[in-house]
């Protein structure tokens, strides 16, 4: 059992409490009552009905009552702190002489403000005709009852308000009419409390009326000061404030449940006629009811009806009534409960950690959850019985009513039945504890004096990565549990999706090593990996497994290498366009700069795809070494990013390189051009791993790329321009650095590896005659090229950090065999020796458009 709630932790925060009274303003010259409640006060209702003067003095009755409920300590007087200082306080003025309509208006207005607890430290005049049981105005057909009780009935039964009454100060054996009202109209009792005053020595205050005929809804309480605050008027607000604190602890409780909780947890003082249910016990009250008793339930069960929350009863609960759980929420029973009635779960959940004496009936929409609980009688299941941890002991019979019933149990959890267990074709669902890794095991699920029938279905709770079957004997049900092959499961679910299948094989390889470790063999698998593997085994759906596989796969490390090659090709294409400009007549030595940007896609069936972005630039110098020959040197920098879908992650590659390039040949006729470059890159990868939890892993590595390109072609001149067919060959070499992701059970580790791709190109360039316009003498260009490369796979061998000896292949997007380029460009000679140029290049692959590169630059030619 967890630590018991401390009453001091509850101050009524968020609970609306009303006070029907008068004399709220008091006298600020002589007391601080109004100042003390200023922080709690939300509204003064019916201010026109205030009567500040009574018997020639400043009235302060309502002010004192309010301060007892929610007042703060104020420097300068000795009045103590209120019982529930967190409440929202509403003061409602009621005249000394009032009508039934005025009372109804006050109660209705309070209800409209959300007030469900109302303190009433007032009464009708102390006249024998209002004294039950024989007073003439206490009869059901009396004028007073017929006039006022409909408003009270509306407040209790329509609005759900709990009305707390002062028991009166006439030293009588019974209270007067209002405190005893349920004696006249029994329907009021569900929302009625009357409070008699006692002293610290448990003696009834000499002026206080005894509970008498109101004993069943009467509770005893002290005022905050036995000597100064005399009268039941000042004991009642203590109980009203206590109700607010219980309401804070159990916000779902209606007026009847609040009443039952306060009365059932009171300390029995022996004489019911004097003290009712006994002395208020706040410490017990905030821990839930202590009785389910027909005297309190008024003939039925205690009803816990709430949605969307988990609420706990800590007290040992006795009584002759039962419990009905309604609503979707969960009610937790911690105590040793001996109430004799049945526990009926019509909806929602009852969590049993303690014990229940009577029968338990689980309806179709109900759940009984147990972890070490004891059911001391029969359990009938038409919904779900869920046992985990320390299981459930049933001292009677267990009866499942048919296929609509489910028994859900965890591996290692035993349901023990002293009587017979009648399974009745119901369903069995077996869940695996989060921290329990399964290889192959046999567990006992049920032990009984007699097992009758069988389960109609047996399923694994998660249902994907382990299997369950049941064996039956005369007295028990045993479970055979085995781990499923992850690769086989993935193949059945995701056939053709290479990335997921590779990830599944990787996990299966690591799980095989984990099996060996769990079974006692010497296997290099960390405890953290076993824990994460155990949680991963609990994956509950194909969608969840897909997300786990996508995130675990590490395919981003393979696929992002394709980004590196794409990055290299984009830089090479931009430089090739620049080299082609060297063929123009009059091209002399000079220097140039170029900026480029691009967007693209990485995609291949079966793998996570990515949107890519590229930024970069080049700075170069050209030198004409002969009439037909030019050599150049350029400095290149680039920054490429890729965001992968399907939990692939994010990749960033930043590079700096040098290129040597040249062209030999006249403007028209045959030519040869070439480029050789080397680039130093740093690549960062960030991704989330959704395997038995969420891990953010990061890695950085240093790569090197060497690129070679050679081209020959022939330029044919025409009146309108020039046509140049060409062929080219290229070679790219990527030396990828080692991969070492940050610590994590499923983090990847891989040694460095190199990749090569050779390719051939066939293309055609078009160039217009110079056009003279405001932007300068401009030449337009266009080209198309087909590229044929060897379809390089970028896979590599890796292992999980938590199972470093269980290596596997990481697959990702490879380099395609067939690609093509189309481009447009323009160059323009400005005044003097400055020219500008711009180009657009589009790359196409098997999936369509894969890359867009925009470039623009300036060149200055030397004299």
PLM features: what roles do these ranges have?
Residues 252, 263-314, 318-320, 330, ...:
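Outer-membrane translocation/initiation segment of Type V secreted surface proteins
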Residues 742, 746-863:
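Outer membrane beta-barrel transmembrane domains
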Residues 367-442, 760:
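Extracellular beta-strand/loop-rich repeat segments of large surface/secreted proteins
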Residues 21-24, 180-248:
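Extracellular S/T/G-rich loop segment that most often corresponds to the catalytic His/Ser-adjacent loop
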Residues 517-722, 814, 825, 837-862:
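Outer membrane beta-barrel translocator domains of Type V secretion systems
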Residues 68, 73-74, 92-94, 219-275:
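Hydrolase catalytic cores
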Residues 60, 72-76, 91-187, 227-237:
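Substrate-binding/access-modulating region of protease and related hydrolase catalytic domains
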Residues 2-101, 113, 129, 188-191, ...:
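Subtilisin-like serine protease catalytic core
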